[in-house]
Each structure stands twice: as C-alpha cells, then as structure tokens.
Amino acid sequence: MREPSAELIIDIDRIRNNIIYLKSLLKPDTKFMAILKANAYGHGLNIISKSIDDLVDGYGLVRLEEATSVRKYTSKKILLMQGVYSEDDFKIAYDNKFDLVVHNKNQLFAFENSDINIWLKVNTGMNRLGFLPEEIISLHKLYDLDKRKYVLMSHLACSDNPKDQLNEKQFKSFDQLADSLEANFESSEDQTLVIKIFSLGIHFL
C-alpha cells in the first residue's frame, strides 16, 4: 500500500503578480507591507521575502528570530507585530531598527525610548490584542504621546467580508479615537509632530 503524499509548489511569479495587482488597486503613494509571519505562512520566509523585496515597502513579522533573518538582506521597514517583552529583546529590536507594536501594558517600557518607531494597537472589536480606546486616551496623557510620532493601528475582525457590519463599527471606533487624539495634539504647544494613522486589516502574502 502506497503512503499518502502531498507536494506544495510555490510559484514566485504568481506571488509577485498578486502583489503587483493589489498595488494597482491602491493610490500611488500608498505603502505596501508584506505580512510574512509564521515562516511566510509556511511558504518559506527567506525565499519569499528575497523574491518580493523590490515590490514591497516593508515586512510584518512576529518572531524576533525571523525579523533578524530578514534584516540580513534588506534595509526596509520591519514591523514586529506582537512587539517585545524584555529589555534584551528590545535592544535587539533597537539595534536592527525594527518598528514595534505595543498592544499590552507589559510592553509600555518601549515608550521610554523616543528613537524607536512605535505602533500603538487599539482593540476596536476583534478582541484579541490591543488597548481599548479609553485606555489609549489614558496612555496618550500618561506618556505625553503628543510629543512624539507613532502609528495608531487596529485589526479588522471580518476583513474577508467587506459587507459585515462589524467592519463599519470598527472603522467608526477607530476614526473617533483618531479624531480625539488629533484634537489633543493640535491644542498642544509643539506643532511640528504628526500622529500617523494606519488601519491594519487584510493580510496579503
């Protein structure tokens, strides 16, 4: 009796064409980040990232080991999507110029360094990672975030179904928070910094 077998064939040209097509749907100045967590979803992190590096503006990864591996052959932005939890890991992230997601209170020490790019995650309805909107307001005041640049981000729970009503609720919650933060910023003394707003939803390889 023959053993069952399976073969996965990865077509790099099709992956590249997918990215080119997706970018054609976006405004010309829109940045494109490739989310390649979990070994590029099992496709092979190194071969995929090297093959698409000329098409993307950065990478989203979870494990520090994967991020340092990709950094060896690209200078583009690398986002650690679940941040770091220790001072040692923070130093590695800092030395490699990684951006960090901050999504819980155990990661707030990252705000003590003003030279690292922070993406502050707000839970608008997915209920997996991130601070509640009212917690973001408190953090904004506690850490004087109107004095530094950071990215406000969220994650759509139903991005595969554009008609789902939860999407609209999440966007509304996100926009309300962003408007509130911008209002606080505009009333501050320093007018040279800008709060960057970014809504993370659909993951494309």
Residue ranges and their predicted role:
Residues 2, 6-10, 14-17, 30-180, ...:
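Active-site-proximal beta-alpha core segment in soluble small-molecule metabolic enzymes
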Residues 196-205:
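Active-site loop ensemble at the mouth of alpha/beta enzyme cores that anchors a bound cofactor
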